[in-house]
Amino acid sequence: DVQCGEGHFCHDXQTCCRASQGGXACCPYSQGVCCADQRHCCPVGF
C-alpha cells in the first residue's frame, strides 16, 4: 500500500491526492493528480 500521510493509505498503483478540505483521496492512476475542482482525480497532464 501507499501511505498518504497520517493514518491514510491507498492501494498499490494508486496515487494520493490532497483535497482542498485537507483530506486525502486515492487516485486510480499510478501518476494521478487532483483536478482543478479539488474533488476529483485526473491523470497527469489532464
Swiss-Prot record:
Signal peptide residue numbers: none
Which residues form each disulfide bond in the chain?
Answer: 4-16, 10-26
InterPro entries assigned? Granulin, Granulin_fam, Granulin_sf
Q: One Pfam family, please name it.
A: Granulin
User: Major place of localization?
Assistant: secreted
GO terms for cellular component: extracellular region
Q: Where in the cell is it found?
A: Secreted
Q: Which UniProt keywords apply?
A: Antibiotic, Antimicrobial, Disulfide bond, Secreted
Similarity field: Belongs to the granulin family.
User: Could you tell me what this protein does?
Assistant: Has antimicrobial activity against Gram-negative and Gram-positive bacteria.
The protein's name: Antimicrobial peptide eNAP-1
Native source organism of the sequence: Equus caballus (Horse)
